[in-house]
């Protein structure tokens, strides 16, 4: 299976997310089918960081030793009380993504993800929630997105 996680996604994430961190962090990704984003994040976060990779399936992928793989639904995973960021690229169903965003914004101020075209309505719904002031960063050269509470 080929990945749609492209060099443009990687550049966008380095420039707008990962460059903010120079000390160890705790972060997570949801969805690791090909392992492409897993390998990318694991090599672009500071040394001694904690990186969780959550998926409902145990995909046969090669990942570095600094990755903690978790076989679980993202909504059922007992995540740490605090994350520096989470990257969503698992179930793209609108209601599921809305629930994921709500869940993870309780433990982080940065939720990001992939396939913005597939999850656009979920992003629109969250962005329209005036109870929580957020900014949404998109780039028309990639499919990744970043939502921050400000």
Locate predicted features.
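A short alpha-helical cap/connector motif
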Residues: 1-87, 91-150
């Amino acid at each position: 299976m080929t990945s749609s996680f492209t060099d443009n996604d990687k550049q966008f994430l380095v420039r707008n997310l990962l460059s903010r961190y120079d000390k160890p962090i705790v972060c997570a990704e949801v969805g690791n089918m090909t392992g492409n984003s897993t390998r990318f994040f694991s090599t672009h976060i500071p040394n001694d960081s904690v990186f969780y990779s959550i998926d409902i399936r145990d995909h046969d992928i090669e990942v570095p030793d600094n990755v903690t793989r978790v076989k679980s639904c993202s909504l059922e995973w007992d995540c740490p009380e605090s994350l520096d960021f989470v990257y969503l690229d698992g179930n793209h169903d609108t209601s599921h993504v809305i629930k994921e965003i709500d869940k993870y914004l309780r433990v982080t101020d940065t939720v990001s993800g992939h396939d913005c075209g597939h999850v656009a309505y979920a992003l629109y719904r969250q962005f329209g929630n005036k109870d929580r002031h957020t900014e949404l960063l998109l780039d028309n050269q990639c499919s990744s997105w970043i939502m921050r509470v400000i």
